[in-house]
UniProtKB/Swiss-Prot annotation:
Residues 55-80 are annotated as: Disordered. GO terms for cellular component: apoplast. Belongs to the CLV3/ESR signal peptide family. Glycans are attached at residue 75. GO terms for biological process: cell-cell signaling involved in cell fate commitment; regulation of meristem growth. Residues 1-22 form the signal peptide. This is CLAVATA3/ESR (CLE)-related protein 4. PANTHER family: CLAVATA3/ESR (CLE)-RELATED PROTEIN 3, CLAVATA3_ESR (CLE)-RELATED PROTEIN 4. InterPro entries: CLE1-4.
Amino acid sequence: MASFKLWVCLILLLLEFSVHQCRPLVAEESPSDSGNIRKIMRELLKRSEELKVRSKDGQTVLGTLDSKRLSPGGPDPRHH
């Protein structure tokens, strides 16, 4: 009986491994393809410029990422 349980266990393990195969999500591209890298860099630069806002004195401050909250914030400041 123990032999039968062992075989069932091994078959279940093999079936489990055969169902879950490792595959890359994106097809690999050649490392010499610098056109895509340039495109990605341009997009990152454009998005980072969208997030920046200049103040009156010329300093760059982050516009949407600035937190206006006072620490600890919330309705009850003595909560924590």
